[in-house]
Amino acid sequence: MSNTIAYFDITIANEPAGRLTFELFDDVVPKTANNFKHLCIGDKTNEAGVKLAYAGSSFHRCIKGFMLQGGDFTRGDGTGGESIYGEKFEDENFELKHDKPMLLSMANAGPGTNGSQFFITTVPTPHLDGKHVVFGRVIYNRSLVRRIENIPTTSDRPDQAVTISSAGVLSPDEFAQLEAERQAKQAGSDGGDIWEDWPQDEEGVDAEKPEEALVVAGKLKEVGTKEFKAGNFAVALDKYQKALRYLDVHPVLPNDSPAELVESFRSLRLPLLTNAALCALKLPASPNTSSLVVSLTSRALTLPNLSASEKGKALYRRAQAYVLKKDDEAAEKDLKGALECVPGDAGVIKLLKDVEAKRKARREKERQAFAKMFG
């Protein structure tokens, strides 16, 4: 790649969060790209001899469904910053449009007021065309952009500090090595995950093609299973849910889809849902995890052509979640349904007895309370 490859190492609340890697569009806006490049390297000073650099500065303004803004290394509040050409420099051109998420564009206070501040789009922003200069894009770790985008804010400032701990530029050899490592990991059989968390951010795969989405989801399932066997239930849950997001690009396949493809989607989606539910059940109990299990298993139960054992498993896991939610009536109903599907299952029988005993004890307690009130 002939264009410059730059990076930010990011911390969130002073904890390492990962690296954002950018391609700068030197071929279209060389002056603007050069400004960003040298602010990443930190090898320039202003007339007063003060170092000009992004390292140590923060993202001071983040608006979900719009953009993340940073680059004010002098004041940190959006009123400062300085370019390598002086305090401000002109708009180079508006050839590139804000037609997609993950673009780098210059923040400004009007025409010809570019400094060091920039923003990363998280959605298409065509209303900014002709006003802000697009000069790059995020190429790796777009999931980190989404993570930052979803941090709660106060007056648009992230409640957790999002800091550029270090920044720089990759040499062509370093970038070639990075690409080779990614390709080897993708081609390998070790279950590596190199895909973005959200299908719409992944450029290496066309998730709109069912076959490609299926391949990614299958590999992510392998990663999740590996993590599950290692006892890393939170990580496994994350991988299973990520795999579901790739499958869910196609909630329903076209009517003319091959029967084999339809069955492949069904037979992969089902274990992803039930395995994710199992992972959530193994995490510390909370209203969020139990609600997630109910949601996942309820989805599983809507899938076509479920076998008796598949239906029984989903009902049993949903019943476990209802127990955590203290909804014993719903749990008992699901357990009785599960027992019809898998007669004699020891786990189902035990939990059903426990639930029935709890309901009986509760009814007796209520009876005694009423007796005292009206006795």
Swiss-Prot record:
It comes from the Eukaryota. Its EC number is 5.2.1.8. The keyword Ion transport does not apply. It is found in: Cytoplasm. Keywords: Cytoplasm, Isomerase, Repeat, Rotamase, TPR repeat. It catalyses: [protein]-peptidylproline (omega=180) = [protein]-peptidylproline (omega=0). PROSITE patterns: CSA_PPIASE_2. TPR repeats lie at residues 217-250, 270-307, 312-345. Residues 7-169 form the PPIase cyclophilin-type domain. GO terms for biological process: protein folding. Its main location: cytoplasm. GO terms for cellular component: cytoplasm; intracellular membrane-bounded organelle. GO terms for molecular function: cyclosporin A binding; peptidyl-prolyl cis-trans isomerase activity. It holds the Pfam family Pro_isomerase. Belongs to the cyclophilin-type PPIase family. PPIase D subfamily. PPIases accelerate the folding of proteins. It catalyzes the cis-trans isomerization of proline imidic peptide bonds in oligopeptides. This is Peptidyl-prolyl cis-trans isomerase D. It comes from Cryptococcus neoformans var. neoformans serotype D (strain JEC21 / ATCC MYA-565).
